Every structure is written in structure tokens, then in C-alpha cells.
């Protein structure tokens, strides 16, 4: 007799859909539980068996919480814009709107086959204009805001305009102008100043350009695409940026508010990269024609300032052309061209050969003006980090050491230590060779020396103590078609303005030709009718922005839209947002441990500042599921031929087998190899459960109206206790193991006590919902078990009358025995000695010591 899984699973999936079993009552008075999966990018390949792992875990918890009396929000949607979809469309020749819809339909079909309890009435896609209307709305709010450093929060740009009108730039770390000067600036001049404060701004920056992809890549995306074989070079372009750096402190500090894996917290902290140090200017021997007096650098090691023997400026730094002497101009320009062909990843490679060119210019060391210091350019310094220039201390920095060795530059030790073969970097040694007519720090440790140098620099007004972040502003524009249009218009007057909010969504035009131009222009530049825009308030004709948003944009706020997906007026009803946020549990791959989470947190904090959300953080608890590898223990890949399709597994063994096996493989966070034999084993377990409730033919369902024995109640309540403990802790494998123990205990018996086995069905339901629903129905119940009360353990059946005591001889485990819970020391030792195995070991030996650890072990020491 075999469990008819195909018939059962088909029936219950149809039942859940028709009865809308998992639709959330969003205004329910029950306690809420918001359980969210990172929504997938719907690729043409469809799901493989690694995808359902996280989905099954959240489904188990969601079903468990419903049965515990919670109102559960458990939605699903699609992160469907972006470069992969566009590339796939170009390969197939089919428009991305069509391929994306087909891919979504396939993903949805596969997910529904697994029996996941999503509320499909809340399904969303980032490509839906009704959705990206609010992605564009958030963009406009960011564009129309600035970050007030005094309040440490965003404000309307109108507040900044009022401030400039009343007091100029007084009190801001910005070039100074008064209110009268502000009023006399032209609209273009005013806009240029405001752009330096807006949370969205344009900047001419060196970007990562990929000719083959026809687009700019964010620094964070380069590694992925280079890994796929694409060449990425540096190219100066005018790009839209988001001022995420304004939120660096809050992004760092508020990590204390969340319950995330330690490794993820560490990655977030490292990416933000807070460091304290000294910002100081090294003056030119004579000021430049532009009036620039020196090169500004930031260092975390002020104590090593006397060890500076040269300076390095990034090749793409704007001052390079200004500081290069005529004699060095050709060499410098050739080097700049060569370095532009390298990605930041290549340039940061620690073991690469150091290259560079002398600019012909010198500065002097402000701590020791007698020291004339040459200024070089080298690609191991990046313009986007710090100030784009460094003071090089080769004695105490390995990259500087290698560069100095390559070019024969001086190496001056200023910290006690050995530097003959490598740089010596220490914060525990004292300073040497660090004295001048200006200041001396000889004999001081790192802390004292750094503090003294900073105080001296501030007193001389040539430097200041500063907090620096590794975090860079977010490169937000992409030169591609398949993304959210940016709702800005450029006017001939030189002013850029957002379109009125009443005109949102700005719908992506339907282009037949959507391949990259190769010039750096987006394909949207081809939409001639769409490009032209007339300002409704002034009548001025402008040109729409043709770049589109990155794929990250739509995924920054989707968790809010699930709460109120049909709201046409606002991204989420404030009352509902207040009830349902933050997300209680967020589950997804660790590959999103930095970027998606960082960008979502940034947007959420901005929305908090403008009153659109009520919480400081979007995601309370975070869990990363481990990868499921192929049977060959390598990452699943079409090229390796080791991909396992869930459709095939479900067809052969059923959805409940797939669910149970993926949860039984091991701890959720661990990397685990797939095993078809393992699925077969779980399938046999489901058949044993089926036979436990049936005898003879399929129809002979059996439950007995008999009182359970104390032993039966004991195993039941032990199972109830274990499952109740393990599900909230994501210990699904040990919960399933306990369910297996239960079945093993009951299978040999001819008794089928109804009270016990009905409770077992409810315990099984979160893990294997199809078979559980069918058994529940066959037991005579008229309703789905989805909202039945989850069993709770009765403490009286959890009391153990016996304990297990292990026996060691000379500290090595030799045997074990059961004893009464209150066994005395003498009885426990006596029982241990009388075990057959122990008797054999003790024969002819002298017991020198007897040790008893109450309730745990007996250790006999023999000579």
C-alpha cells in the first residue's frame, strides 16, 4: 500500500487556492507575524532544488505561527527588472517584457507545486507600473531632500533653500556665502550648490564601463560580471549618485537593533568601514595657478607622519593634470590611459606589481618642512576612496614598501621594529626618528603620538580630526533599457527638475530596439516621441533622463508594498505599516549580506525621516539558508550538468518528500550536498506514516477511540515538546528526527489511539502539509487544519522516571545503563560494576578510584 501523493497533493493545492486558505486578514486584531523570503529574480532557467530550501523553511514557520494564533503575512513576488533579463532577451530576440512574464509564470507554477502557503493576492513584480510608480516616487523624495548634519536626518530641500535665504551657508561644512549672495546667484548657480547637498545628484566620476554589456556597473557589481568573463574598464562619465554616505553613521549604529547572523553584521560593518584619523594638507612648494595650496590626505596613522617619503595621487584624480610638469606630461597621460583599462578589483590586488609615474611636483611635510616629498601617481590608490591621495610611509605599509623598493624611494623607519624585508606595522611600538622644529613625538606610543599630532595640526589650522568611511555613494544610473525610468527632465536653461508626482508612473516606453548603444547612452534615447517633455507650469520644453534605475531599486522597498499592494495613492497605508513593520523574519541567501540589505536599510531610514515608515530598521531577524550543492558536491550549474529540477523530484516522490528532505539534510544555515537516495528515504518515511493510519486497502483508514497508555502519552508529549522548541529555532532536522522516532515507536503496536495520532497529524502539518491535510480529512474533520491549535506539551508527561548513566574506565566510555532518577552514589557505582562489559574489563584489575557525577556518569580508575 503506497501513499497516493500525486492525487493528494493535487487535491489540496487546488483546495487551498479555491478557499483562499492563506490570505492575510491585514486588519486582524491577532498578534502579527510578518515572514518574508527574499523575492527571486525570475530567470529563464526556472527553479532548481536549492531555491525551495529557504521557501520551505519560512513556510514551516508561517504554518506553525498560524496554528499558534498569529495573523501571518507571508507573500511572494518578483525582482524582475535588471541586466540579466535584458541580456536573456537579447540572446533570444524576444522582448524582455514577454520573457519576464513567461519566466514569472514558470516560477509561480514551480513554487505552487511545493505547497507553499503564500498569500498570492499580494503578488507583485518590480516591472509593474503600479509598483514602480512608488519606486519613482521614493526617488523624487530623495532628489528633493538633503541630509541635515545637525539633526542627523533628511529634510526637504526647501528647508535648505530657506536656510540659504536666511543665513547663507553659515554653519555648514561648505564654501561660505551669505544670504545676499545666495539671492543673487542665477538659477543654474543655485542648482549647482543644491546638487552638492541633494540625496540624489549628478557627478562626473570614473565609472566601471563594460563595453559588452553596454552599461556602467556599480563597484559592488564588478566582481560578479568579471567573474562571468566580461571586461570592465574605468571611464569618466556623468552619472546619478545617491548620497548613502550621509547615512553611514546611522547604518552602522542601528546594526545594534537587529538580530542578524554575526558574519552578516561584520560584513555590513566592514563595508561601511568607519575609521578615525587625521585629515591634513601637504603644501606645495609654491601654490598652483588655480590657487590650490596643497594635497589633502586622510590617514589613520598620524603617528607615522615623519616617515612619509613620497605621496601618491590616484591617476584619475582631477588635480593630476594641474600638478604634472610639462616634462612629465606625456608619461603621466600614457599611464592614466593604461590604468583606465583596469577595474578597481585589479588595482586593489595586493600581490600585483607596483607601477607609477612621477608628476614632477613636490610638496613638503607639514610636520617637518625641511623634507621635500615627490608626488607620484599610481593605480594602487583609488580616487573614490578617502581623498584620492595618500601619504606614503614605506617603512610601515607593505604596498608603500613595495612601491618604494620598485622605484628606489627612501624608506625611513619611524616605529621601532625590523623592516629589512617587509614593512613593519605595529600600534604597540614607540615612535623614533620623529622630531622637528615643529613638533616631536619620539618615545610616544601610537595613541599618545596620534593625539599629539592631531592637536598640533588643529592648532596650526592645517588639519583636523576626522571620521572617515569606506562606504562610497551609490552609483544609481544604468545605461540600459530594462529598468525603471528616472523621472527627471533636463531643461535648456541648465536646470533639472522631477516630473510632477501626479504624472507617475513614468511608464517605460515599449521599444523594439533595446540593445545598448555602445556610446554610453541608454536605449531610451531612441524613444524620440517619449524624450520630449513640456513643463506643465512653465511651458519650457525639456528632455527626459534616459538612464534607468539599477535592479536594486525595486528591491529596496518591496517589503512595504506587500502590506498594502493595491493602494494607488501611497506606497503603504501608514496605519497598516505601523501594525505590520518591521518584518519579523527575513530569509535569503548570504550573497545579499551586503548590498541589498545596505540599500534597503538606507531607503528605509530615509522613509523614516520623512515619516513614511515608523521603524528605524526594516528587518528584525535575518537568516541565511546554506547552499544545496549538486550530488558531486559542487555548486549546481547548467555547465556542470549537476542541476536537479524540483519538477522531476516532485513528479517522482511528491512535494512533501522534497520539503521534508531539504529540511532533514542538516541545519538550515549549512552548505549541504543533494542526495537522491536521501529523498527516497524520506519518501519511505511518508509511506510509513500513511500505513500507520491505514490497514489493508487505501480506504481502510483507522483511528481507535481508546484511552492512550501513559507510555503512549509520554512519547507524544515528548514529541510535542521537541517540535515546539525546534521550529522557532529553525532546527527542522531535529524536529523531523523526533517525528521519525514517534512513528518508529507506534509502528510495531496494533494500537491506534485517536487522541495521540490526531495530535501527531497537527505536528506533521507544517513540514508535510499535503499528507497531514489528507489524514486530517480522513479522520472525519470537515475543515482544513491550517488554523487548528498547535499541540502543547503537558509537563506531567515530560518527567523522566529513569536517567541514562554512562560508564567510563580510566576516562574512556565503555558502557551505559538506565537507573532510577534518584539513584544513590553507591547504587550507581554498584550497577556500573555489574555490567557484563565492565566486569570483563575489571577482571584482575585493582580499582584505585571511583568517581560519580550525579545523574550523568560513573568513572572507574584502574591500575
Curated annotation (Swiss-Prot):
The keyword Transferase does not apply. It comes from the Bacteria. The keyword ATP-binding applies. Gene3D superfamilies: 3.10.20.590, HUPs (3.40.50.620), Isoleucyl-tRNA Synthetase, Domain 1 (1.10.730.10). It catalyses: tRNA(Leu) + L-leucine + ATP = L-leucyl-tRNA(Leu) + AMP + diphosphate. A motif ('KMSKS' region) lies at residues 635-639. GO terms for cellular component: cytosol. It is an enzyme of class 6 (ligase). Keywords: Aminoacyl-tRNA synthetase, ATP-binding, Cytoplasm, Ligase, Nucleotide-binding, Protein biosynthesis. GO terms for molecular function: aminoacyl-tRNA deacylase activity; ATP binding; leucine-tRNA ligase activity. It is found in: Cytoplasm. SUPFAM superfamilies: Anticodon-binding domain of a subclass of class I aminoacyl-tRNA synthetases (SSF47323), Nucleotidylyl transferase (SSF52374), ValRS/IleRS/LeuRS editing domain (SSF50677). Its EC number is 6.1.1.4. ATP binds at residue 638. A motif ('HIGH' region) lies at residues 40-51. Belongs to the class-I aminoacyl-tRNA synthetase family. PANTHER family: LEUCINE--TRNA LIGASE, MITOCHONDRIAL, LEUCYL-TRNA SYNTHETASE. This is Leucine--tRNA ligase. It comes from Leptospira interrogans serogroup Icterohaemorrhagiae serovar Lai (strain 56601).
